[in-house]
Structure formats: structure tokens, C-alpha cells
Amino acid sequence: MEQRRPWPRALEVDSRSVVLLSVVWVLLAPPAAGMPQFSTFHSENRDWTFNHLTVHQGTGAVYVGAINRVYKLTGNLTIQVAHKTGPEEDNKSCYPPLIVQPCSEVLTLTNNVNKLLIIDYSENRLLACGSLYQGVCKLLRLDDLFILVEPSHKKEHYLSSVNKTGTMYGVIVRSEGEDGKLFIGTAVDGKQDYFPTLSSRKLPRDPESSAMLDYELHSDFVSSLIKIPSDTLALVSHFDIFYIYGFASGGFVYFLTVQPETPEGVAINSAGDLFYTSRIVRLCKDDPKFHSYVSLPFGCTRAGVEYRLLQAAYLAKPGDSLAQAFNITSQDDVLFAIFSKGQKQYHHPPDDSALCAFPIRAINLQIKERLQSCYQGEGNLELNWLLGKDVQCTKAPVPIDDNFCGLDINQPLGGSTPVEGLTLYTTSRDRMTSVASYVYNGYSVVFVGTKSGKLKKIRADGPPHGGVQYEMVSVLKDGSPILRDMAFSIDQRYLYVMSERQVTRVPVESCEQYTTCGECLSSGDPHCGWCALHNMCSRRDKCQQAWEPNRFAASISQCVSLAVHPSSISVSEHSRLLSLVVSDAPDLSAGIACAFGNLTEVEGQVSGSQVICISPGPKDVPVIPLDQDWFGLELQLRSKETGKIFVSTEFKFYNCSAHQLCLSCVNSAFRCHWCKYRNLCTHDPTTCSFQEGRINISEDCPQLVPTEEILIPVGEVKPITLKARNLPQPQSGQRGYECVLNIQGAIHRVPALRFNSSSVQCQNSSYQYDGMDISNLAVDFAVVWNGNFIIDNPQDLKVHLYKCAAQRESCGLCLKADRKFECGWCSGERRCTLHQHCTSPSSPWLDWSSHNVKCSNPQITEILTVSGPPEGGTRVTIHGVNLGLDFSEIAHHVQVAGVPCTPLPGEYIIAEQIVCEMGHALVGTTSGPVRLCIGECKPEFMTKSHQQYTFVNPSVLSLNPIRGPESGGTMVTITGHYLGAGSSVAVYLGNQTCEFYGRSMSEIVCVSPPSSNGLGPVPVSVSVDRAHVDSNLQFEYIDDPRVQRIEPEWSIASGHTPLTITGFNLDVIQEPRIRVKFNGKESVNVCKVVNTTTLTCLAPSLTTDYRPGLDTVERPDEFGFVFNNVQSLLIYNDTKFIYYPNPTFELLSPTGVLDQKPGSPIILKGKNLCPPASGGAKLNYTVLIGETPCAVTVSETQLLCEPPNLTGQHKVMVHVGGMVFSPGSVSVISDSLLTLPAIVSIAAGGSLLLIIVIIVLIAYKRKSRENDLTLKRLQMQMDNLESRVALECKEAFAELQTDINELTSDLDRSGIPYLDYRTYAMRVLFPGIEDHPVLRELEVQGNGQQHVEKALKLFAQLINNKVFLLTFIRTLELQRSFSMRDRGNVASLIMTGLQGRLEYATDVLKQLLSDLIDKNLENKNHPKLLLRRTESVAEKMLTNWFAFLLHKFLKECAGEPLFMLYCAIKQQMEKGPIDAITGEARYSLSEDKLIRQQIEYKTLILNCVNPDNENSPEIPVKVLNCDTITQVKEKILDAVYKNVPYSQRPRAVDMDLEWRQGRIARVVLQDEDITTKIEGDWKRLNTLMHYQVSDRSVVALVPKQTSSYNIPASASISRTSISRYDSSFRYTGSPDSLRSRAPMITPDLESGVKVWHLVKNHDHGDQKEGDRGSKMVSEIYLTRLLATKGTLQKFVDDLFETLFSTVHRGSALPLAIKYMFDFLDEQADRHSIHDTDVRHTWKSNCLPLRFWVNVIKNPQFVFDIHKGSITDACLSVVAQTFMDSCSTSEHRLGKDSPSNKLLYAKDIPSYKSWVERYYADIAKLPAISDQDMNAYLAEQSRLHAVEFNMLSALNEIYSYVSKYSEELIGALEQDEQARRQRLAYKVEQLINAMSIES
């Protein structure tokens, strides 16, 4: 599901306000269902839709005009600037607008629609025009969208108040060294007096020029503008001109418009009656009088269909073939345009649309011809809308050339003959809405957007094919239309596509989708060719060495092909030489490997284009499946140069012995031979024992040949003679022939006699089969010899056994039997039999050979259709026995109820069925039987029915329902009498047939057709056979139902959750249903009509077999409604309906049975119990204990069931949506009844207890009097405490509500002080070490510098040897003296040393991690402990690796929310008192750092003198009167130097704080001086309250004096007078500040005096009773933790959401994260670890806990800041929450849990779901190839290769080589690869070289 990200904050360049900016949302998650992944940018507000888009052709910046905003984006759609343009208070009726003069109209907050967005390249500015204030424009600086000018004080500045986008277009024309001109066309919405529809305006280079946007020429007689005449608007009230596109070409400016036609003298007041025409308007660039105005209609046609409604257009150059078709050059301009069909409904155009092309040269030629004809006096000016009448052309002898710009006659000029374009492509379904084109490799490539959010890619070749669509891409999953503006990136590799709410960057090609050369080169994409040795489809420039022969194939004939000889071998042939011929291959001299599928790979011998390979050995030959005689696999050639398989062909292994019959053997596709006498198939003919027994062709196989059908009557003894071919003569020792028959599963073997090689006979035998329901049984049989050698039966000959009597009980059925059976009717025995079995001599045996044979005694058994109308036409079906043997026998002898009924030949079934059609009955005929004769009407051939046929008169009474939707599909029921009579019925609604559904005697049901005449009533007519039933009924067609809203817009995968559908006319649907389609499968569920506007539905399941993952949110491919026949709602696009995963439950207990005590709640644990959907809808759970429901309470992970009062064992069932789940059973055990001894004991004990209670009561009464006074005293204390608790809670609540707004507005988001890369890396790698050797050049004492450097370069070679480096690290880790600190140090040194070779470092790191995982699992450690602690070099290297590769991500994305969180914590802490000694604060997230008593304080504003310029305004600084002087200094420094990095600021300890009282009197304030209060052994630090500093006092920070001085003796000042600052005391004798005495040495060490600030140390017992009282029940103050947490919540959320998102401001997820997570998944797969918790934990330990937690706790690693102790404590709480969010363990909390855990208890489940989704999203991203990763690592290495000194790092690493040299050399000598590379020797060389120098 698409999830919208919050918009981060940034400064906006608009001078009027600062706004919140959007984060770019980059889609890298997989679309559901095949959705491509593109960079996207979304609107920050759903209602602020995008309007225009343009791309700067120099910088590649993307500018987007939207409602209320103009955005500047980078090429990859990362936002840079958002410029606010609205909303503002306005009213369209205010003219001039209220920004010029006050307006009396009612003002409302009005959106500003961007209508024009043009780049003025020569002046580096952007022209943006909106709809506010009558359509004023702004000129914005391109770099930062700073407003250069916003002209608005003249009427020329108001372009149009139309607030609809797509109605205005502008073209900037600029001549060298001159001011520019802006040609602008706009719709005016009837305000023709205020706004011209077309004008040219001045565009001075100076933005402040008073002539800005003035008309180029404006006088009383002639102007550079055209207005719509009021007469035209009087004639056509909705007349307006919509400007769709504009451009400059040659010396002209062109506009493409759509406008209504204006018929002469006919007024049109309805917009629906308008006919629109699309026109080309041309003006000369240098024609301020507009004399050159020419307007011609244009469009195109195909197959007689006219396309006249312009939708979009684009000017481009033609490709070679298109230029040739137009007879122009490739440098000429061609206009590509999209039109919709017809000329009506411009604002709702038809889907039928066309892409057409117009050469500008052809347009100019037609305009020239129009001008010439008019100047010859032919016809009229034909511009009715502007001239109002027919104006005759004036003849003038004026030469008109290609550059003619008009005179003051014959202008403005129109025309009626359209400019016809070449139709390239049409579609009738998905209307095309936008177009863009460019030329690639000589081809015109056209990109067309559609109304359903798809992008068509079309190659425009010109005739005869026109345009060929070669690809279609789904850009917008929500199916919203693509808007007109599309633009290419400057490198033309991407196309920017825009919908109302999304800008998308789509690659112009996606060649990589084609995986074979054939697919690639037959795709039709001109960008794509086949990169042969890399086996990929790509552009030519992405294919390495594409210029070399056959490296890059551009046509399908150039594809590399492979032929192998032989193409197949037997499975028994091993290691055979195969000859492979490679056609069209590049140079293969680098080497080839032959791969046989995944079985084996061998070296190939290359000779030119021939390769010799050896087939697999016996161990590698594939096993052939039992039912096959061959197995094919891919024989692939792998290039050793690229490592890629670049060509393959099928190679087959065959097995002849799989064939059991001769024909299948010799007809096999392989070289198989049949051994006739051994009855086996073999690939080796030499294995046949007899030469003459070897068969190679099918003609030589022993086989049965076709003969006449073998018919055997059951019980008859008969031989079976068969024809054959090549029957073998059994050899000595071999048995003879047999016939084997399989009769109903029983095998019958009959001896057979071979007459010769072509004849065999099964001996005499009789055969039987069971049952009289089978008249003819086909029996499989085979001829075998020698026991089981089968003779082939290629024609599948069968023996047919039959019984004459079976299913032939009557004469008719008997004689109807096929004559081949020779069956006949034995009259005497009344049975069907063979002639020889009819033994009765007196009765004849009838068969077809008998003369004039007829069956007597016909019978009618049933009549179907027993009633009908007297008008006739009813078809009556008669079933019976002996109903004739030929149609002629019954053709004229059927009557029904006395009325002739005509039999129908086509319906006649011999002897069994007659169907006849009734004639017209005479008046008065009512009923009667059916009578018929067979041939002749003699008694023995006549019969009549027992059933009666009745004549009835059908009638209709009513109709239900009486209305239905226009699209039809309504089930209409017509009630009446005798409606079930007759054989057919027809119902008509108007002139259309109502589709028959069913009927009975009282009603007819049919389905209404779509209306052919629109809405309204239609008559209902009914016909029954030939009877027309009178009816006055009417059926009304009404508007189809419409759906407006679905609530909620979600369900779970199993569906069946309730949905409420709101819309119109919903009650006309009889059986509404709701449907979804997902992965090609459809699911439907039922709805119920509530009323005309409301339905209730049950959500369909996603699919019956869908099993979503725990974190999967799916969007169906289609969502809609089955509403009768309403097709428009089958797919409903106005919804974002999504499916959440099904809830899952754990078992109640491992055994499945949970023991419960009565009344105890049952807790069901699970996941996904509460889908995180917005709105109030929740899942409705029903829990049954047995059959009894229980009350349910639901949370995210558990379901609490209050059980009914039951005992015994009961099954628990959970119902939710369409799910039913049983987590087990509960066994409720009641307490057992008490025994008699127990009851006696309890009674005795109770008596004793009662006596004791009486005694205690007497004592208590006496004592209670004494306690009354104490109780009253305690009550007073409790009342006092209660009021203080209430006050504290009230304050905490008020803070919680107000502080978030205050904090958000206070924070300054400018200038984040990022550390440079080197400092950042050092703080992460070597924390606490500021000046590390790796930052300096290597320094060697003495003269050995060169030798040491030489030795270290040798060491560098060793370090770059993977075998050495791995052995080195493993050896160090085995040493006991190699401490944890050493491990971290070595890991950091290695990473700094390999900074320039990160590919190699990554390879080593992966190997170390793989070893670590192996070791972890071998030691039987729990897999979740992996990477938990830094106990190995690999773990620290992993941290450093992420530190290197995530630096860019930190700066561009994650750094901002982290810095904002730090600032928020710091600022929030400083808003309340902070104890300077203990670090405790009023506002804190940490319980340990919370002041737990009431501190009275006031906020003061101090005015600080600007230290840089004392004459500039003073800087106000917020402080607290309880702050110490040092705290005040730090706050002042923060305010004065707020945008200065901490390291560049002065330190508070180096500055003095002066309090200035007047111009001369200055007092230096200090934490400790002679005025400091000392009480007993406690000394309190001085605060502003102590000095009685008042609000708005003036202070200054001055550098600290080098030496203090004492107060002069002459000024005998008492201590009290200083502390009170009497007004009488002013020291004016010196310009220096008066300094209090220098602070004393901390007295704790000298005299036992303890210093305090706000609270004394809690452990001291000398506090006053009042102090202790103020701290009693300190937990009260924990509510402040909650207040602080609420204040900071948004900043924590922002940080977590950024870190747990795969989409970040347009930048992809850092490759390092995806690459490392995939590596961990691979390792889990390798070790068969399928536990998702383990995988989750590995990833959490790897990145969040290893890197992010470190950064969160230590923001000073990333930023140049100071982190105080209270800030550190709060960050630690956030970091702990972050760690808890990544954990998979259950979050169990109780009243004794730490407060920081309780603080975020409710948030952590949500954060956990973010983490799970984050990991799942990463897993779905496409894998990063090693090639892409290495390229990325190489780039990172290049960027930072010189940050650290390599030799210094190596020198530091060498110290470990030196320390453990013996162990290292020993390990190298034991390693085989190290021995082969003589690494131990090289180490000894290194040690010797370094030792010499030392």
C-alpha cells in the first residue's frame, strides 16, 4: 500500500511566509502485481493538484506548477524549493483586485491555480501565472524561486481569472540583445472586456521595469491583442477559446486552440449543443499589429472516422523514415498532436482517440495558399466569431511568399478547409491525453500518456505502418489520467510524467526487461540492442566494447546462435566429443566454458567460431523420467571474459530402452533400433543377435493392419481372422501366438495360429459380457507371441461384442439398430434377436430386408406442452413406442385436440419422438387428446394419448420492478394467467427483446436489455407462440447507479468485513455484488440494499488461496461492483481500497488445552489483530466458548475474552471477517466441594476467630479515641498534598497541550552544522581521539623515512592480499592478549587503510561475517546473539563500513530529523530549570535526571549587546531567573551564535557576563563571588534571582579579564549592599566593569562546604521539614516525563520514520543497507535458518543497533555541537526506545518496569510494525548485482581516497604484526594457499625491513 510520508521543514524563499516543505517520495517497493518502480514526487496536499511541468534544458531542474505552490525539484525529483502562491483571501468579482484597491465583495480563502509556467532562459527566471487576483504573474529567480517582481498594479497585469488549468498557453520570443516578448493566449470565461483572448506583451530584461507585461502596441486604433466580441457571446453564451499548446518555429508563433463553432444567426445557450473545432493560429513574431493573424481548422481521419477534438500536442524533429514520408529534412519541425473522435463533448471527450503528425512546412504551405486565394479576392475571411459577419476578401496584387506577414486588409483571416495530418496510431478504449517525442538513432519515438495512467511508447515510421506501439507502461497505480505536460530530462534518458497528484520520472527505455536476444530485437524498441557477451538487452552506450564486431546486435539476424553436433546422445554414452558452431559471435579467444544445465561445466576448446566440448561423464548424466524416452537440458556457453552465459541451445539425452513396442522405437526422434527377436529397443544396432532381426523403419515392424470391423455376437462361437505384416516366425525355444482380450477387466487368452507373415487367426471361442444396459461393447485386444512379445496395433483395432436384445425392448427400437448387427424383431417371442435365434415358425422375423416393414401397436407415453393459445404456433413434443420407422409414416397423421399438428422433420427421432407445430384452433375448441397413425390408419397402427391438450388465453396483470438502470440487467417479473402455456414466449421492452430467464403459469421472468433510446418509460409487450397478449404495462429506464464513497476503504485478506457503499439509484439493483480481482483471480461477495443511496456489502476475499505475509498490505488489481449490466462500475477507480493481512492467533497452549479457573479471562495472543487503518472502523471479533459467545476486548497483539459461566472442556472458536480459527480448547475447573471433616474444622476455627475479634474490637474502641487527634492532623496533611498533586497534574497537562506548537514555531531549521567527512569518520572509528596518526603524514625519526615507506608499501601489498589479511585477523583474534580495545582499533585501522579499496574491504568483510556466522552456529550459540556485541574485528569493521557508506545518506536525509530532535530536546530542557550541579531538570525524558520538587521560577528576556557591533540592535535572549551565570552565558552564546558551529564559537568559560545599568555602570556577574550565600556547610551558586536582575535588562558578553582586581578600599561597600544592588551604589570611576570577587576554589575539598544550585543532594538528612515535604511522593512529578515525551513525540516519530523507510526525498535506499541485508538472508538460507525472528534480529543487530543507536546517542559524531548531560540522558532514552522497536521479543511491562520503558510502551508496537515493514520492503527490492555494488564502492573510494594517510595507517597496523609475528608466520605456514603464495616469507621480509630501520 502506498503510504504518504510527512513533509519535512525547510525555509521557503517566498518573502511573505515560511512554509513546510515536502519530502520526495521515491517508490522502490514493488508494485504489486508487476508495477514498475519509478522516482516520484507527490503533492503535499491532496487538494493542491499539479497543473504544469517544465524542465530546464541547461541544469536539468524540474519546475512544477501546482495549486498554491511552485516547486523546484532536482532531476531525480528531490525537492529543493517550494514557493507558496496561495491560498489567499480573494473574490473573482473584485476588479481591479484587492491587492490594488479595497473590494466590497465577500472575500474567501481562495486557491491559486497555476495556469502558466515558462522558463525565460536569457534572463534566468521563471514566469508563473496563477488564477488569483484576476490572474497576476510572478517572475521568480530560477535558483531559489525568489520573487523578482510581481506586477499587479495595471490592467495589463491581469491575464484571466479563469481558475481552470489547461486553458492558457504562452510563448516567449526573444531577439539578440533586445527585450523579450510574451505571446499569450487564454480562456476568458465571458469577461471579454477585462481580458484579451490573445495578446503579445513586453518582457523587459529588467524585472523592475514599469513596462513589464505591457501590450507590445496599444493605441486607440491598433493593438497587440484580440478580444472576443460581445456579439459572439450573445450568440453563443458558452463561447470561449481554450489554448492547448503553443510554440515558435521560424519567424512565426503558433497556437493550437479548441473553440466552439459559431453558426450564423443561430443562438446556442446549451453547452451540450456545441460543436467544437480545433484550430491552428499563426502570427508573425514581429507583427505588433496582429495583421498576420491566420486561423485554420486541423485534425485527422482514419477509416472514415474523424478526429477533431485536440487533447495535447508537442513540437519535435522527425526521424529518418518519417522525414522521408513527409518529404522534409530531419531538421524540419513536426507537430505531434492527440485528437479525440468527433466534435462534441470537449470537456468529456470520447475514449476513441488518435495520434497524428503535421509537418510545419505543410501547415505553412496551406496557410500560404489560403492567403493567396484571399488576396486574389476569392471567398470570405471566414472568421465569424471575431468579425461577426461574412466579410469579402479584397483583391490586391500583393506577392505572397513564405514569410508574408499581412497588411491592413484581408485580416484577421480564417478558413474552413482543415489541415489534415498523418494518422499514426488510434485507440478506441483508453483515451490518449498527452504526447512527447524525440529522435533516437534516426527513429521518431513518441510517448503518449493515457487517461488511465499508462504510458504508450510508439515508434513513428510513417506509411504504411504509421506508428507501432512497442511497449506500454503502467505509471500510475491509481489509474488517474496523465496530464498534458510531459518533458524529457536533459540527457533524454528519462521522461517526466505528471498526474494531478504525482510527478513520475520514467526511463525512456527499459531494455533490461527483455531476457533473450530474440525478445530484445523483436520488441520494436529502437533504443534496445543485444550486448552479446554480457547477455543483456541494453542501449549501445551501456554495452562495453560495443564497437567491436558482433559485440552489439541491432537486428534479430545478428543474434548469436549455437548449433551442436550431434544434437543428442544416448544416456549410456559418456564423455563424448561435441562440436559446437557459434554463428554471429564476437571474438571468443578469451575462453569459453560449456555448461550442461546445472549438472556440470567443462572447458571448451575454441577454434574460430567452432568450440569443442566433452559431454558429461557417467556421474553427471541426467536421470530420465520413467514416462519419457529423453531429457533435454540447456547446453550453455559461458564467456570467461564476462562470466556470463551468452548463448544456449537444447541438448538431449535419450533412452531407447524406454520403448516397449517396435513402432514407437523406430519412430522415435532419436537413433533407436528394434531387435525383433529380442523384443527390445537399443541405440546400438550391434547388440541385436540376428542381423535379419534388426529393424530401422516402421514398414519393417511386425504389426496388425486394418481389416473390416470385427463384430462378435455374445455367446456365438467364432474365430477372429486378422491381417498383419512382418509377423516373425518364433525361433527354437520361443512360444507361439495368442490373442489377449480384456473384457470388463477380465483377461481372456485365446490360442492363435500364424498362417504366414501377413495373417494370424484367433481360434474358435465364444465371449460374454455382463449387463443388458450395454448393446455394443468395444473390447481392447492384442496379439502376442513368446508369452509377452506384443505385435504393434497402430490402428488400435478392437473387437466389438454385442447383444441384439440389450436396450431394444420394442420393435421400433430393434429395427432402428445399425444393420451391421443383423438384428431383427421376432414377433412371436416379442424380442430383438438374430434370425437364427427366432425359433417360432408361425410368427415372422422382421428386419430391414422385409418388404414394406412396419411396427404395429404404437403407443404415446407422454406429451410435453399440454396447453397453448388457440392462435397456434405451439410446438407439442410426443414421446412413445413404435412411432414409425420413417418420417413419411407420420408426416400427415397427427392431430392434437382435433386440430392438425404439423410434424417437424428436424425434431423427429425414429420410433421414439415426434415434435409438431399446432395450427389455428376453431372458436370453441377447448381440449382433447393427441391422435396419430403410423403409415395407414388401421387399428393396429393407430393410438391416442391419455393426456389432454388444453387451449388457453394468456393474459398479463402487473410488472415488477417497474424501473431499472439504463444499462439493463434488471430481472423483470411479469405476472398474469396462463403465462406458462405454449412452447415459446417473447417479451419486448420498447423495440428490444427482454432476455428470457424462466416462467410458470403465473409469471414470466426476463432480463432487461440496455436502453437504446436513453432514459424514460417504454411499453412492455408479450407474445406466447403466435398469440400477442394485450398489455398497458410500462417499464422505466433511469440513470445507472453511481457510487460515491466506500467506507471503510480496507478489509483483511479473507474478506467478509462489512462495508457501507454510498451513491445514487442504488436501490434499482436487485442482487448487487462487490468484486475484486487479484493476480488474475476474481472474488465476489454479496451486498444488501438499505435505501436508494446506501448499500451494505461484505468485502470479497482477496482470493481463496491467498496467504499474505505478516507485513504485507495488498491493493487489488481491480475493484468494482456487479450491478445488473452496469459495465462502468465493474472497475471502480475512485477508491484506494487495500487489504491488510489476516489476523493470526497463537495456540492457547502447546497441548491445545488451556486450564482455566472460573471467571478468569482467556487471553488469545496473535498478530495483525488491529489493522493500522485510518478512521474509526475496526474488525468485529466473535469468540465462542463452546456454543456461548463471550465479551471481547481487542489490542494490537492480544484479544481478551471474558468467558461465560461455564465448567468443563469447551472448544474456543474465533470468527473475524471470513476467517474461522480455533486456537484450542479451555478446560474450566471449578473448586471441589468441601468434605464433612473440613466443614467441622472451619466451624471450630470460625468460633475461635469470632472471640478474638470481639477482644480486638474492645481494645480498638479505647485506642480510637487516642487516634482521633492524630487522624485530623493527617487529614489536613493529606488535603494539602492532594491540592499540590492536582496543581502539578494540571500544570503537566497544560504543558502537554501547549508546548508542541510553541516548540515547533521556535526551532530554527537553517544551517545544520554537519562535520566534514574526515572528522565524522574519526569520531565513529576512533572515538575520543582528536589527533590520530592516520590524519598526519608518516614521521620517522632519524634518516629512515624512505626505507620505512618502502617497507610499508610492501606491507600494503600484503594487506591487499585477501589470504594474508584474513589469516592476519584470524590469528590476532586467537591471541588472549588481543583485547576488545585492540579488536576495535585493528578494525578501524584496516578500514582507514582500505578507504581507497572499498570493493576489496567489502569482500573481506563478507568473508569475516560468513566465518563469524559459521562459528556462532558451530558453538551452539543462539543465532540471535550474532552481531549483538563487538567481540570480533568483523563486527567493528561492519560498523565502520556502514559509517563510510551511510555518510551521504546522513547528510542528505537522516541528519535533519536527528538534528531537529537534538535541538528540540536541548530547547525543551532549557525552557525549565536545570540543576547546574546534579544535571537534573524540570523537563526530562529520564527519570534519573528529573527534578522531583516544585521550583519557583520566572522567564526573563535579557537584551544582549551584539558582540560584533555594539551599535546594532540588541539581541533578545530567553533565560530563567533561577539560571546560574554560566547557564545564562551559554544561552546567550546559543542565541548570538545560533548559526555558527560549536567549535567556532567562544566558550562560556572564556567570557564574562556584564550587567549594564546605564551607560557607565557595569557589573560582572559570576557563579561564585563575595555575595554567594553560605548556610552551614552548603553554598548556593549565584543566579539571576540572586542578583535581582529584572526583565529586559541589558547584558553583554565580554572577553574574561586576564587578572581580577578587588574592590578599591575607598569604596567601602558592604556585602549586603552588593547583593541588593542599592540604587545609591554606582561605581563610575573606571571604564572597566566592576568585577565581583574572583570565584573561590571549590570548597568541598578544603572546608567541607558543599555546593548546590536548585536541589540539595537527596542523601543529606539536614534538610528542613519543608524541603522534605516538597519532595514527598516524588513520583507525582513523573507526569512531567509524559508531558516532555508528548512535546518531543513528533521529532522522535520523524526520526524513526526516516530511519525505517525505504523512501527518502527522492534518493534511493542506500545500496549498502540492501546489499548487507541480502547478504544476511543468503547466509540464513545457506544455513537453512527459516525462523523470521532470527533473520529480523540479525538485521537489527547489523544496522539499527550497531550503527543508528550509536549515532542517536552521539549526535556530536555527525554535527559540530555540544551535548550536555541532560541532553545525553534524554537521547539515551530515545536510543533505548529505538532498540526496543527493533526487538522481536515480547514487550512485557508492569508497574515496576523502568519509567523510560513505560513512557514509550504504547508507541513501541507501532514502531515495531514500522521495522517489520521496513525489512519486508527492503527484501522486496530488486537485488543489487555485485557489478553495480562494486561500481558504487569504487565511486565512494574515489571520493574519499585521500582522507586518511595510508602509510600512517599501515604503520599502526604493523605494530600488531610485530607484536604477534611468530603466531602470524606460523599460521601462514599452515595455510595451503598462503604457502603457495610464500606469504610467510614475505612477512619475514617485511619484519626484517622494518627492524633494520628501527
Curated annotation (Swiss-Prot):
Keywords: Cell membrane, Coiled coil, Disulfide bond, Glycoprotein, Membrane, Phosphoprotein, Repeat, Signal, Transmembrane, Transmembrane helix. It is a single-pass type I membrane protein. The chain crosses the membrane at residues 1238-1258. Detected in fetal brain. Glycans are attached at N76, N91, N327, N598, N696, N756, N1205. Residues 858-951, 954-1037, 1041-1139, 1143-1228 form the IPT/TIG domain. The keyword Cell division does not apply. Disulfide bonds join C94-C103, C129-C137, C284-C405, C300-C356, C374-C393, C511-C528, C517-C559, C520-C537, C531-C543, C594-C613. InterPro entries: Ig-like_fold, Ig_E-set, IPT_dom, Plexin, Plexin-A2_sema, Plexin_cytoplasmic_RasGAP_dom, Plexin_RBD, Plexin_repeat. Residues 1-34 form the signal peptide. One of its GO terms (biological process) is limb bud formation. GO terms for molecular function: identical protein binding; semaphorin receptor activity. GO terms for cellular component: plasma membrane; semaphorin receptor complex. Residues 35-1237 are extracellular. It holds the Pfam family Plexin_cytopl. CDD domains: IPT_PCSR (cd00603), IPT_plexin_repeat1 (cd01180), IPT_plexin_repeat2 (cd01179), IPT_plexin_repeat3 (cd01181), RasGAP_plexin_A (cd12790), Sema_plexin_A2 (cd11272). Residues 1259-1894 are cytoplasmic. Its main location: membrane. The modification Phosphoserine is found at S1612. Coreceptor for SEMA3A and SEMA6A. Necessary for signaling by SEMA6A and class 3 semaphorins and subsequent remodeling of the cytoskeleton. Plays a role in axon guidance, invasive growth and cell migration. Class 3 semaphorins bind to a complex composed of a neuropilin and a plexin. The plexin modulates the affinity of the complex for specific semaphorins, and its cytoplasmic domain is required for the activation of down-stream signaling events in the cytoplasm. This is Plexin-A2.
